[in-house]
Amino acid sequence: MGKIIGIDLGTTNSCVSIMENGNVKVIENAEGGRTTPSIIAYTNDGETLVGQSAKRQAVTNPQNTLYAVKRLIGRRFEEDVVQKDIKMVPYTIVKADNGDAWVEVKGQKMAPPQISAEVLKKMKKTAEDYLGEPVTEAVITVPAYFNDSQRQATKDAGRIAGLDVKRIINEPTAAALAYGMDKAKGDHTVIVYDLGGGTFDVSVIEIAEVDGEHQFEVLATNGDTFLGGEDFDIRLIDYLVDEFKKETGMNLKGDPLAMQRLKEAAEKAKIELSSSQQTDVNLPYITADASGPKHLNVKISRAKLESLVEDLVERTIEPCRIALKDAGIDVSKINDVILVGGQTRMPLVQQKVAEFFGKEARKDVNPDEAVAMGAAIQGAVLAGDVKDVLLLDVSPLTLGIETLGGVMTPLIEKNTTIPTKKSQVFSTADDNQSAVTIHVLQGERKQAAQNKSLGRFDLAEIPPAPRGMPQIEVTFDIDANGILHVSAKDKATGKQQSIVIKANSGLSEEEIEQMVRDAEANAEEDRKFEELATARNQGDQLVHATRKMLTEAGDKASDDDKAAIEKALSELELAIKGDDKAAIEAKIAAVSQASTPVAQKMYAEQAQAGEGQPAGEQAKPGDDVVDAEFEEVKDNK
């Protein structure tokens, strides 16, 4: 069986890890980075770029460069957070036929799982290049506060990328695994505060020794799936736009290229202000008007940035309070605070967390890599390579059904340890009612309409009976991925109806299979393109080497030889400009054949010259060896 890799599919950056010989290793990508930007770009010549290469060209191609797509995964177009996102990003967010939020690139509508799959494919390839073997299985992390639709959509993204997702686990839980694996035996309670690029989670986790097993039990979790580093960037961008407007009277918000440059500059400034007190944002030629080009130059202090984002940091404290309350634990009982996510490097975040929990956060956990490392550990547990770890996670939100009067009746309360199964008996609301609709909901509100609708299905052919008489048993079953299976059974007839919740939207099986086929076709195209590029490079190198050889050969090459070689080289150069790999390879062979007589002649002459070398010169290396041996003997005395 192949390795199960661990992937942190992040809003801003992604990371892949593997467990080898009992140690967890973060795998570097082809560019040498330990994390990969979760950015996908579609270029004008039909190429799909992922990661650093996509980020580099974003300024010149903002409408077709997609970032922070994780914030759209499993979401409806009408949701407030999506409407807010539409105003913030340069690419186009559209309403899919099923009501989901999709993106449109070059006139083509694409589902967020399809785009996230491109990042997962890059992670998969990174692992395969390192391991030297195909990778088909993965553990993928999601924010703890992701709802059912978002978890399902993440699993779909894995399938489209050609991965069998063995488990979806929560990011804070994964970070706790990475932190707790090498800690001394004994019980302790930790807080994982995870403020990433697009989402915020906090989990209270108890790490205990139970019968020799390392047990990680999530006691409670809370969060906000639309709060993260991207929001901090937006505050800074808005400030820079306002400052520029005050100075020049020009609004940069209508200029996608200027806004993309601002986004990059704001992100860079934010990072710099974590280690310095002041920085300059200097963007020459940001725009122009009739009077000429305009430049943006704004000084920003750390204090100014903190004043812009203070309320965002404050927003993270309330979920911490709720999580502690739900866990039934006093803040004084917390042994360690672990910070995860790049945004936690901000001094203000660290200060507020320390104030609330009454202790400094640990500095020995890498906020960018801990989540992927935890996923790799979970992968090793599932593969049977790690035996003494037990992970007990929870369902982050209450699950229930809509009952008479538009009320949500809970079946599984939030923070219930998963996997879990709960049943409850309901009945009909009217006499002789022949069918009931089971409307599945997720959320904490009493009114059904205020919660997230996960799906609905009908149980039909109920025998006629007075209202309240039929007994309909509804069963909720949450698997270890946090994905819900619901069934309804008429106890009188034994008739049963069940569904795996796929949300009332989501991707259909046909759509996923089509996307898998498209991805496989693209992979074949990518392979062909790579082979063509390799052949072109070989051809270029041969042209250069052969021309160099001809120059060195001088009169040693006859005019006929030179003419034959030049003809073959011209034909190879022409083939390199084309797209036919076989033609390039044929012309490479022709150049090699044409240049062989000259190369052999030169080799023979070099060999003769070598034989005629004076003996004294050949003795020198021997002298050196004797000296070295002599010194070594002296050292050993």
Curated annotation (Swiss-Prot):
Biased composition (Low complexity): 605-619
InterPro entries: ATPase_NBD (IPR043129), Chaperone_DnaK (IPR012725), Heat_shock_70_CS (IPR018181), HSP70_C_sf (IPR029048), HSP70_peptide-bd_sf (IPR029047), Hsp_70_fam (IPR013126)
Coiled-coil blocks: none
Induction, as annotated: By stress conditions e.g. heat shock.
Keywords for this protein: ATP-binding, Chaperone, Nucleotide-binding, Phosphoprotein, Stress response
Keyword Nucleotide-binding annotated: yes
UniProt superkingdom: Bacteria
Region listing for Disordered, in residue ranges: 605-625
Residues with Phosphothreonine modification: 199
Pfam families linked to this entry: HSP70
GO MF annotation terms: ATP binding; ATP-dependent protein folding chaperone; unfolded protein binding
Functional description taken from the UniProt entry: Acts as a chaperone.
Family: Belongs to the heat shock protein 70 family.
HAMAP family referenced in this protein's UniProt entry, alphabetically: DnaK
PANTHER family: HEAT SHOCK PROTEIN 70KDA
The protein's name: Chaperone protein DnaK
Species name: Stutzerimonas stutzeri (strain A1501)
